[in-house]
Amino acid sequence: MDIRAAEISAILKDQIKNFGKEAEVSEVGQVLSVGDGIARVYGLDNVQAGEMVEFPGGIRGMALNLEVDNVGVVIFGADRDIKEGDTVKRTGAIVEVPVGPGLLGRVVDALGNPIDGKGPIQATERRRVDVKAPGIIPRKSVHEPMSTGLKAIDALIPIGRGQRELIIGDRQTGKTAIILDTFLNQKPLNDGDDESQKLYCIYVAVGQKRSTVAQFVKVLEERGALEYSIVVAATASDPAPMQFLAPFAGCAMGEYFRDNGKHAVIAYDDLSKQAVAYRQMSLLLRRPPGREAYPGDVFYLHSRLLERAAKMNDDNGSGSLTALPVIETQANDVSAYIPTNVISITDGQIFLETNLFFQGVRPAVNVGLSVSRVGSAAQVKAMKQVAGSIKGELAQYREMAAFAQFGSDLDAATQRLLNRGARLTELLKQPQFSPLKTEEQVVVIFAGVNGYLDALALRDVGRFEQGLLTHMRSEGKEILDAIRVEKALSDDLRAKLKAEIDAYAKNFS
């Protein structure tokens, strides 16, 4: 028997090299059945609920149903590449996404992967998507304004930082337009140096057309608003688990800012589609259906998401996360299951109506049905002073307008009320992409409630407003600055403002 020394030394070297190496142990299971984006897996005995698992080819999934003999896994991707008998690996990690300032200006999917072709994400850390909302002690009452730049909202339904304000209405009533204007309105704050005033924007698109999302991103980019925004997109062609996960992923990204003493606003567009995706997953996982075939925990799905929007107290960095959930109603039915759920969770709602939209009242806000339950505490004092009477006047106007259809001989007081109401309604109209600063809104509404529009023809109201703003930006600049700094209308400032509007109104023709 010949001894080959070279071979023996090679074997020994190999053995020495591998000495002390741990064998990699990973718990694996087998796919029992797969279909409709759901895989039944046998053998993952110690898997956690919500844990990420991996299929061959790098496809990821999430364990949702932990049953006696198998695990129900929802698949984040196409299930056509997964077949019966495939091995499934545990990752040991609950679903998490990258967070941090590196995501600003980017478009990502529900797992935080970039989909905008601008290279990898520079994330500072990763966070779990589904975490517990802050308790009662670390919170603080909402007290800072979150300006949308829309007169109808900032005057009548003010939103504060840390509030949850629902935007609800039928399709094509301008729900996304309100979100877009709100994002664009934050540009002056984000361009400034005051870090405590900056408001980062996160837009979560659930179940929308890709063209719609692309259009939204294009507008943000053209107007220089994408640099302080994050877009999380789970479009209509994405699997239901991605649409279910996207709002939670966006929320985790927003919580990074909230927990670091910064401010963020997140818009979920829209939660009706998330509920539909969740219903699809639940029914395929054979969970028992409830009202309208939604699962029993669909209320908890939305409440645990929206409770994460909060205003933190000073000990916790005094950051905030404001939520603007969107719900699409069918034929103005706000008493359906999902709309009533979300109305009861949020701190108020902005109700948009189709017939107002087609009458040319845009934003199509129904002032009677819309409320803000905590926003008035956050409203700027100057706005409170001028807008206090407008809500009452509009309510009276709507009531009278209904009766006025039947009678032609109305007394002078009623005529005056109808006249003023029509002009105030006209004044609250606003074209898209033209948000106004708070001090400019104060001036315009001041002119409206103090009778400067009463003598004008309805068609001239918009022209009067534009002219007044142009005049104030040049001639009355110090008055605008004073309103911005003082945040209130003192008697002296009120007199100056009155004189300035008088001077403009005299020359208006």
Swiss-Prot record:
Positions annotated to bind ATP: 169-176
Localization per record: Cell inner membrane
Leading EC class: translocase
UniProt site (Required for activity): 370
A cellular component term, taken from the record's GO annotations: proton-transporting ATP synthase complex
Entry's EC annotation: 7.1.2.2
Catalysed reactions, semicolon-separated: ATP + H2O + 4 H(+)(in) = ADP + phosphate + 5 H(+)(out)
GO MF entries: ADP binding; ATP binding; proton-transporting ATP synthase activity, rotational mechanism
Main location, first listed in the record: membrane
Swiss-Prot/TrEMBL keywords: ATP synthesis, ATP-binding, Cell inner membrane, Cell membrane, CF(1), Hydrogen ion transport, Ion transport, Membrane, Nucleotide-binding, Translocase, Transport
Family matches, as InterPro entries: ATP_synth_asu-like_sf, ATP_synth_asu_C, ATP_synth_asu_C_sf, ATP_synth_F1_a_nt-bd_dom, ATP_synth_F1_asu, ATPase_a/bsu_AS, ATPase_F1/V1/A1_a/bsu_N, ATPase_F1/V1/A1_a/bsu_N_sf
Superkingdom classification of source: Bacteria
Membrane topology (UniProt): Peripheral membrane protein
Family per record: Belongs to the ATPase alpha/beta chains family.
Record note on quaternary structure: F-type ATPases have 2 components, CF(1) - the catalytic core - and CF(0) - the membrane proton channel. CF(1) has five subunits: alpha(3), beta(3), gamma(1), delta(1), epsilon(1). CF(0) has three main subunits: a(1), b(2) and c(9-12). The alpha and beta chains form an alternating ring which encloses part of the gamma chain. CF(1) is attached to CF(0) by a central stalk formed by the gamma and epsilon chains, while a peripheral stalk is formed by the delta and b chains.
Functional summary from the UniProt entry: Produces ATP from ADP in the presence of a proton gradient across the membrane. The alpha chain is a regulatory subunit.
Record PANTHER family: ATP SYNTHASE SUBUNIT ALPHA, MITOCHONDRIAL (PTHR48082:SF2)
Listed name of the protein: ATP synthase subunit alpha
Source taxonomy: Bacteria, Pseudomonadati, Pseudomonadota, Alphaproteobacteria, Hyphomicrobiales
